[in-house]
Amino acid sequence: MAIVKVTDSNFDDNIQSGVNLVDFWATWCGPCKMIAPVLEELAGDYDGKANILKLDVDENPSTAAKFEVMSIPTLIVFKDGEPVDKVVGFQPKENLAEVIEKHL
């Protein structure tokens, strides 16, 4: 499955069921650009098992504030609508895969 871009208005609907890794990012953020291809790979690897979502913090400040996102990229794993894990900064694919795996 492809990465899904979410907004303040549809965020809650998109995280309600299953395992969802949300990338809180911005267009001007260098590490956010570096992690994008890693997330694309994970979206393919976990197709049908977990969803990869992206939320632009500049366009959607309410959701970023709700989850206290202070630095980007911040990646939060939601399971059935609840935040269960959080990592901040660029992460190699293996690290993110481990984070996803422990919540499947």
From Swiss-Prot:
Residues 2-104 form the Thioredoxin domain. It holds the Pfam family Thioredoxin. Disulfide bonds join 29-32. SUPFAM superfamilies: Thioredoxin-like. The keyword Disulfide bond applies. GO terms for molecular function: protein-disulfide reductase activity. GO terms for biological process: cell redox homeostasis. It comes from the Bacteria. Keywords: Disulfide bond, Electron transport, Redox-active center, Transport. One of its GO terms (cellular component) is cytosol. Belongs to the thioredoxin family. Component of the thioredoxin-thioredoxin reductase system. Participates in various redox reactions through the reversible oxidation of its active center dithiol to a disulfide and catalyzes dithiol-disulfide exchange reactions. This is Thioredoxin. The lineage of its organism: Bacteria, Bacillati, Bacillota, Bacilli, Bacillales.
